[in-house]
């Protein structure tokens, strides 16, 4: 449980730092790199600090107990939070937590496999319907796979395909070019691979709520970068924004894939705001936002990984049945816990 709380705290602090840094960027600047840097750091740092920069709750409890309390309420609360016996009781639920962890990972994995199977069926059906005709089809210079309802989206890891539903082909040529260019930009930038690799962290750590948020921010950054590239190539951001709204209305009943023209759920308003009416930063904000972001990063780098027992690899367990004590333990929790060295 300590590890879960620490990993989420690190991810949330790093995510806030990335959010502030992203906010300080010009509206047309690439954003994905911020999250591509923060996400690996939030994964690697807790594991590295576990072995090289740990903080023992048992030692902190002894030091706190030896000091005069600041007050009855604050003294009792601080001793409770640092009591290894209390944390050891929480650790007794680790078996149940691990079972939930494996169950959630299995459900997410099955959901991902089901989505891949569904896309594979759509591709096979499209190939059969084309018959002897060229597959995939080429529309406005972009190679596409025409579907009944799925899309617009880019799918595939090794070989990306642009999926467009039939109603996209009926759009006016200018609007259709925006849709196809958006998906083609996703394909050229290998956004599908990026989001697939990033989503693996969710399968491995479904309890990491901070990672869910980081992945969502990465998806938004990928879509905003793609919007900027499309507007730079084709121009007229107002027409492009109107198309996004129209596509959202037309595709509301179809399955949602990533990366896609509509992006993640609930991100369309943010994309339109940045694209059509970006809020200019004041001079103070341009310096203050990066400074606060660096401060959060410094806090994370200074925050050790908490462990129950003494030493970076020690942990505390509850004794069952009879009381077992370690050599010269603190009398306040000697009857409840035993410190085992790995």
Language model: regions and residue ranges:
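An active-site-proximal "capping" alpha-helix that borders the catalytic cofactor pocket
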Residues: 135, 177, 220-235
